[in-house]
Amino acid sequence: MGADGETVVLKNMLIGINLILLGSMIKPSECQLEVTTERVQRQSVEEEGGIANYNTSSKEQPVVFNHVYNINVPLDNLCSSGLEASAEQEVSAEDETLAEYMGQTSDHESQVTFTHRINFPKKACPCASSAQVLQELLSRIEMLEREVSVLRDQCNANCCQESAATGQLDYIPHCSGHGNFSFESCGCICNEGWFGKNCSEPYCPLGCSSRGVCVDGQCICDSEYSGDDCSELRCPTDCSSRGLCVDGECVCEEPYTGEDCRELRCPGDCSGKGRCANGTCLCEEGYVGEDCGQRQCLNACSGRGQCEEGLCVCEEGYQGPDCSAVAPPEDLRVAGISDRSIELEWDGPMAVTEYVISYQPTALGGLQLQQRVPGDWSGVTITELEPGLTYNISVYAVISNILSLPITAKVATHLSTPQGLQFKTITETTVEVQWEPFSFSFDGWEISFIPKNNEGGVIAQVPSDVTSFNQTGLKPGEEYIVNVVALKEQARSPPTSASVSTVIDGPTQILVRDVSDTVAFVEWIPPRAKVDFILLKYGLVGGEGGRTTFRLQPPLSQYSVQALRPGSRYEVSVSAVRGTNESDSATTQFTTEIDAPKNLRVGSRTATSLDLEWDNSEAEVQEYKVVYSTLAGEQYHEVLVPRGIGPTTRATLTDLVPGTEYGVGISAVMNSQQSVPATMNARTELDSPRDLMVTASSETSISLIWTKASGPIDHYRITFTPSSGIASEVTVPKDRTSYTLTDLEPGAEYIISVTAERGRQQSLESTVDAFTGFRPISHLHFSHVTSSSVNITWSDPSPPADRLILNYSPRDEEEEMMEVSLDATKRHAVLMGLQPATEYIVNLVAVHGTVTSEPIVGSITTGIDPPKDITISNVTKDSVMVSWSPPVASFDYYRVSYRPTQVGRLDSSVVPNTVTEFTITRLNPATEYEISLNSVRGREESERICTLVHTAMDNPVDLIATNITPTEALLQWKAPVGEVENYVIVLTHFAVAGETILVDGVSEEFRLVDLLPSTHYTATMYATNGPLTSGTISTNFSTLLDPPANLTASEVTRQSALISWQPPRAEIENYVLTYKSTDGSRKELIVDAEDTWIRLEGLLENTDYTVLLQAAQDTTWSSITSTAFTTGGRVFPHPQDCAQHLMNGDTLSGVYPIFLNGELSQKLQVYCDMTTDGGGWIVFQRRQNGQTDFFRKWADYRVGFGNVEDEFWLGLDNIHRITSQGRYELRVDMRDGQEAAFASYDRFSVEDSRNLYKLRIGSYNGTAGDSLSYHQGRPFSTEDRDNDVAVTNCAMSYKGAWWYKNCHRTNLNGKYGESRHSQGINWYHWKGHEFSIPFVEMKMRPYNHRLMAGRKRQSLQF
């Protein structure tokens, strides 16, 4: 059996048990007890007139058992009146028919609830022993309920499932809800007050207690009684509806009293300090209050405060014993001071109507001025003040036109910042600065020059009428911060500052000393400024050959200039360089000395002459000065020799002393200059004994005589050789000039030679043939044979001849014999001008008187001639080419010999006779060689011709450029084998003349600086060592493209930033600018080459950005330069007007979105004027060209029309929504050409459409006159909505739409350009009604915009 079945069984059981118990307990003869049991479900549907007796329960719904007990008293056993009184005391006066007693028992686990209601009829006597019987009944019912509860628990435990009750339950009538159905009588037993079959007819309660008449169940009571059953006594006038009637007496409500509650009661019975009059206390003197319980305050606190204990507690904004005085502002403080304004702040109550600010200079005769601000302001900025003045400032609070006592302060404005600072003249040690004068009085100026490193500085003060100053004594090349400050008493203005750098000073007192032919030593005093390098330039005066430039590192103050051209005029200058700045140069000129002749040598020598030859000086000298003397210095001789045409010059010194060593010095002479001499020592040959003659001869002796040798000698040596061939010698003292040879062979021919000797030096011999006895000239002797001359000697004839005849001719040309007549004393002759390699026939004839002897004949062949015109070319480090002209005579080959002039072996090479040039190889670099050349035929060799040559230096190798940047490159090379004094680097680019750089010989690298970016360079290099230079090597390189410089971000706002840079030095095509944010977004822009800035727009707020910039040229890109910045955030994320846009940093006028009430869903595009009178204006109307028709209907004016960037009307709905956000002010700007006017109103609003968009404006200010106040409070009118008060339709009449009244003083939406009366765009107080204003703008902004903007600026400053 289910739960529903269990519930039905329980219900039936309980009903049955209740009926049985109640029936068995109540006696019918006494009171009748009716018990009704009703089971209902909670939350069941209520029926009209009562509750249904039975409803079928569902499984989930709780079950409620209602037990109703009606105790009826038979009519024939009505109780007496005494009983009735007793009964009335037991029942409540509120009960109508029955006294009810209710009880309830619940079982929450099974959701079964038992309720019991026992009804006793009113005014009935109690049943006999009713209290005891009822108590017993209740006890048994409780026992029954407990048993049923136990039974339910058992059934819930499935103990009754087999015997659960089943069957159909009948419907029990509900007796109209005013009775219970009785099973005994099978009918309704009605409740008290009801009767009828279904208990549906009412009885009057208690029969109206016999104090009234029952009409349709309702009692109509007698006049003294009341109540539903007329059982209550009536109170007088029903307590006047101000109290409760209890047993006929009024219990009055507060604050009423009296029998009928008509009188008012006084509070606290007036505290004994007054009397009550109709509820109001009339207090005694000195007391006040509703209950007269308070002490009276002075003047009743003037109605501006509360009286507490006799003292006034004033309302906000008032003070004083009787609250009659306005409280002054508190805590007056200076928030900011400038030269022409003072910003004040104070604390004040909200009740203040306005504040009056009074200010006056403390100086005698100062004008007192006032300024008024609204009472909700807590600060003000006083403007248009005089700089450097002290002002007495008083601030008054005003309430209802009553001024408070002032709060005061004494504040001095700052001196104005000097303006127009500029520099007129800048030198190494002076700077002339000037600035603009002030228009007000002050004491003077202070000018300071402070070095950037803050070390030292100078300060000067000048009178106030001076506006320029020349500061001297500054350091050259120093950067100074220049400050100009105005002074007045103890006050100082803010400085105006600028930086200036003095010109770097150059080197001074340049001096050239120790000038030689190729070297000069340059000295200077270095500059005082810090410089990057010293630039030394020198070159020939006149510009020939260009200028050589050296970069020298400071603090170098001297330099040796080398490789100069001898005897030349040079100009040298030195200057200092720092960055791109070059100082003035110090310049001087000098002339190099003439170089001495080189390679001085003796070509040939005799006893009385020396043939000298030397290499010409490099200088263009005119002549040479030859000075010579014996080593003893007895006498100096001087001779001037013109410069030879060729590479050498020759000179012959004659009349010398034979056998004497001479010191020779040769100096080059040019104009008045003379070089140092080239010197050498040379010795003349010993003088031969001359005029050797045979004075006598015998069979065994020969007597000789000669002329004494003129030079110093030790002795003479006589050699005599007979024809037999055995030579003999004899030494003769030097003072002898004759000698007789004895013990000779008789009849023999002797060859006798006499030589002078000194030490190991021997003179040429003097030879003579002699005969012992009579002997003729026997034969000729040939010596000193050359290619063009020969020396011939012979013996003396015996006896001596009168004269001698010498004949000679080539063998093949004997018919052309040449004859030479000789003195008889001659014993030798020299034949000159002979042909080389030619056999000559020579005969000698002695003439004795008229007798001619037989000729003595001999032959001699001249030597072969040497090659001519030897030259050197193609000199390299290890080879030279020798060239020459061939000799005349035939020969077999050439022999080329060469050896170092210092120490080294002699090498030779054989060259065929068919060539005239030969390359000598395998030489040492940078070495001087002596090269000789002669021709060879058989065993015969010609004379040698010689020359000197220096082999070239070895080249440096592997020249490369590395570490290349836009302005620098590192040159590296490998040194040559030989010693290097210096390297010379010539740097060229394009067609520009090269720059020469000198590098020390020990270096193998050099850094080039200050190069031009993106430029192709050629670096050529060679080594030098003294006069020698190596071959050149070169390399090419290109500098990189230099990047833009000084990349900066400025004017950073929430969504934009200005990016600027300095362009690279190189020519470029464009820039590539990339910017990226921290969220990973990236954007690349191509920027024209001529641009140096770009404004980035549309950036994200509060975002870090990195900007990368490169320059580009063709396919070449520079390195990247970068910067970073962070965009700002919005003060107002969703601006609701243009003022908030302005405070967000949007300073450009234009179209912006606003969000009404800050809601994103109420977005509106408006035009913002960010410049007029502090900006922040929403423009809602503009007329400027007549292109837009303003004669429109209501619907257009409601939603708006036109272009917000041209002519437009924003719309009445939009204007209303904007002005509903807070207090706004209105400004109307009007222009006619150059003439302008405006009108402003400190309040502006437009009501909604239900109020026809009525206009509300405040107080006027401006220059146009107040023409709009006439329209105050007027609704808007269009041609189809006439809301004006005029007889006609103003909008129709004047072709516009406006807040017309009758009709207008201003008509800003009238017809454009219409000048007829009142038809155009009018503003009466400016241009009248017969002028149409060409330009009009209507705009609004929050009333407190100035204050908010000022506070925002202040917060940004702090």
Curated annotation (Swiss-Prot):
Xref: Pfam families: EGF_TEN (PF25024), EGF_Teneurin (PF23106), Fibrinogen_C (PF00147), fn3 (PF00041)
Entry GO CC: cell surface; collagen-containing extracellular matrix; extracellular region; extracellular space; glutamatergic synapse; membrane raft; perineuronal net; Schaffer collateral - CA1 synapse
InterPro entries the record matches: ECM_Regulatory_Proteins, EGF-like_dom, Fibrinogen-like_C, Fibrinogen_a/b/g_C_1, Fibrinogen_a/b/g_C_dom, FN3_dom, FN3_sf, Ig-like_fold
Description of post-translational modifications: Contains N-linked oligosaccharides, O-linked sialylated structures and O-linked chondroitin sulfate glycosaminoglycans. Contains N-linked oligosaccharides with a sulfated carbohydrate structure. O-glycosylated on Thr-36 or Thr-37 with a core 1 or possibly core 8 glycan.
Organ and tissue specificity: Brain specific.
Annotated Fibronectin type-III domain residues: 328-420, 421-505, 506-595, 596-687, 688-777, 778-865, 866-955, 956-1042, 1043-1130
Keywords per UniProt: Cell adhesion, Coiled coil, Disease variant, Disulfide bond, EGF-like domain, Extracellular matrix, Glycoprotein, Phosphoprotein, Proteoglycan, Repeat, Secreted, Sialic acid, Signal
UniProt cross-references to SMART domains, sorted A to Z: EGF (SM00181), FBG (SM00186), FN3 (SM00060)
Modified residues (Phosphoserine): 724
Cysteine pairings via disulfide bonds: 292-301, 297-312, 314-323
Localisation: Secreted, Extracellular space, Extracellular matrix
Outcome when changing residue 397 to T: In NEDSTO; uncertain significance
Coiled-coil intervals, chain numbering: 127-157
Sequence ranges assigned to domain EGF-like in this UniProt record: 188-199, 219-230, 250-261, 281-292, 312-323
Gene3D superfamilies in UniProt: Gamma Fibrinogen, chain A, domain 1, Immunoglobulins, Laminin
Annotated NCBIfam families: GGGWT_bact
Domain notes: The EGF-like domains mediate interaction with CNTN1. The fibronectin type-III domains 3-5 mediate interaction with BCAN. The fibronectin type-III domains 1-2 and 7-9 mediate interaction with SCN2B.
Role description: Neural extracellular matrix (ECM) protein involved in interactions with different cells and matrix components. These interactions can influence cellular behavior by either evoking a stable adhesion and differentiation, or repulsion and inhibition of neurite growth. Binding to cell surface gangliosides inhibits RGD-dependent integrin-mediated cell adhesion and results in an inhibition of PTK2/FAK1 (FAK) phosphorylation and cell detachment. Binding to membrane surface sulfatides results in a oligodendrocyte adhesion and differentiation.
Assembly notes: Forms oligomers. Interacts with CNTN1, TNC, and FN1. Interacts with BCAN and ACAN in a calcium-dependent manner. Interacts with SCN2B, PTPRZ1, and CSPG3.
Protein name: Tenascin-R
Organism of origin: Homo sapiens (Human)
